Regions:
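Extracellular, repeat-based ectodomains that mediate carbohydrate processing or recognition
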Residues: 2-518
Length: 518
């Protein structure tokens, strides 16, 4: 055992460092989006990358539609998101198909005609189709209609302005609203209508001026009692490079005569520094009397190896004093699109894949938090990949430590030049002088290796006050014990022991600090 001590001692330290590195990788890739909020829980897959309707039943169950080639799958989950039932419908489906499903009644639109479940045409040449909770809206020939799912009869609601081909519906607690939007140059006109028994009544109208270099990309609105809020997403016109997007919000009330003003929004990154970038798929709603946005954006995450940036799901709450409070609702290295709110405590989104897209949810429900905490095969693979990437950094960091290693090497070479073969004798002062020179180099050039960025990235057990000096001295003690064992068991002379001491010390240090050097 004593003969092997020279490699066993540093090997134990290095292997422990690699294990801690892997454990940190596991911690990073499985970090919850925020406190008391679950990681993503996969509940299904779909072949399309567009909106998928979700219904919450009076009993608290969820009916989620997933699409496959020529097949609609309706899955029923309980409040813990355990699947309790499933039903499939054989209808032609692609990413353009929109489906209304209420109980066992199915009506769908193929971007041209509206069909019943048997494939019979109900309405031909329908431009748009809006499946809602218990009714359907559609646009045909510049007119907005309501389709009664019970008797399949159509009622004209309102004639739309020429060239208007889309509306934004909103299902309130008691009423159904829809918004029309028209943009001319930098003038944006919005009209809010309430659906009535006699058609539609315009309840609010306003217009906004946006920057002349911007165009409207998306709009949304929300109504709660008499409170009304608008969201505009615009894109900066640019001749080169990626377009830059902007988000605006305006708040008012139905019946108000005061013109609302657009407020530009910047979303702070709740997990990192700075702001979230490229927010998209933005929806607006009132949650517990407070205005809140749900969206996907590029923000900080430690689930990735190098970039520490990925698209995740976020919410932004706008307080009464105008402050914006962001919260992260997913934490994954994979791209997230089309976030959707199921209720106050649960969100859902698509995670893009090469052939199929995964459907995931996250929630503050304790049962979901517990269920989502289980490590998956993907978690292990991502943690291993991140660990191997960190080990590659260790190899590069070793190059930076040559500023330490070169000094004992130069000392040994110079002493051989001066003393020659006499150094092969056991000269204690030569060995200890070489060790002292190396240790002086580690302290003199301390800041070249132990840089500020390293401490910002490293875990807590490496960043306490004086940690770099404590680890340096502790590993020096281990290296010294291992080095001294070679004197009696392997008859190593001073030059070999000096070089071994420096090499073992460097390997132990970089096994712990190297992954966070850059």
């Amino acid at each position: 055992m004593r003969k092997q001590l020279f490699w066993i001692l540093p090997s134990i330290i290095i292997i422990t460092g690699i294990f801690l590195m892997f454990n940190q990788s596991i911690t990073d890739v499985t970090e919850q989006p925020e406190a008391n909020w679950s990681r993503g829980l996969e509940i299904g897959t779909t072949t399309v990358d567009k909106t998928f309707p979700v219904q919450e039943t009076p009993g608290g169950n969820f009916i989620i539609q997933t699409y496959e080639q020529d097949k609609l799958r309706a899955q029923i989950f309980n409040h813990e998101f355990k699947q309790i039932n499933e039903k499939t419908y054989d209808i032609p489906l692609d990413k353009w198909t929109r489906v209304f499903l209420n109980h066992d009644q199915l009506i769908y639109h193929d971007y041209n005609d509206i069909y019943d479940q048997d494939g019979d045409v109900i309405v031909s040449n329908a431009k748009r189709f809006y499946p809602l909770g218990s009714t359907i809206l559609y646009i045909k020939e510049n007119n907005l209609y309501e389709l009664n799912p019970d008797d399949l009869s159509s009622t004209k609601i309102v004639e739309l302005n020429k060239g208007m081909e889309d509306i934004i519906p909103f299902q309130g607690k008691k009423q159904l609203y829809f918004m029309t939007e028209q943009s001319l140059n930098n003038d944006v006109k919005l009209n809010i209508y309430e659906l009535t028994d006699n058609g539609a009544k315009r309840v609010y109208s306003t217009s906004f001026q946006i920057d002349a270099m911007q165009t409207v990309e998306d709009t949304d609105f929300a109504v709660r009692d008499s409170n009304l809020a608008f969201m505009l997403e615009t894109v900066q016109k640019q001749s080169q490079g990626s377009p830059e997007s902007y988000t605006y919000v305006a708040k008012t009330s139905i019946g108000s005569n005061r013109e609302p003003s657009l407020k530009p929004l910047t979303f702070p990154d709740p997990a990192g520094e700075g702001s979230l970038s490229e927010p998209n798929d933005i929806t607006i709603s009132y949650q517990n009397e407070t205005l809140q946005l749900l969206f996907s954006a590029n923000g900080f995450t430690e689930t990735t190896y190098q970039e520490n940036q990925a698209f995740n799901v976020y919410t932004a709450t706008i307080t009464d004093n105008g402050e914006i409070q962001s919260a992260r609702k997913s934490n994954t290295a994979k791209g997230t699109v089309d976030p959707k709110r199921l209720n106050n405590s649960t969100v859902m989104w698509l995670e893009q894949g090469s052939e199929r897209n995964n459907i995931l949810i996250s929630s503050s429900n304790p049962a979901v938090i517990d269920k989502a905490s289980t490590l998956s095969q993907d978690d292990w693979l991502r943690a291993l990949g991140k660990t191997f990437g960190m080990l590659a950094k260790v190899l590069i960091t070793i190059l930076a430590t040559t500023i330490w290693f070169i000094w004992p090497v130069v000392f040994v070479v110079l002493m051989y030049v001066v003393k020659g073969r006499k150094l092969d004798e056991d000269i204690s002062w030569f060995f200890y002088t070489g060790i002292v020179i190396y240790m002086l180099a580690t302290f003199i050039f301390h800041d070249i290796i132990f840089i500020d960025g390293m401490f910002a990235r490293a875990p807590d057990y490496l960043t306490f006050t004086g940690s770099s000096y404590i680890y340096t001295l502790f590993f020096a003690l281990i290296a010294f014990i291992a080095t001294q064992s070679t004197k009696a068991t392997h008859d190593w002379h001073a030059p070999a022991r000096i070089i071994y001491f420096a090499g073992a010390h460097i390997l132990m240090l970089v096994a712990y600090f190297g992954p966070y050097y850059f």
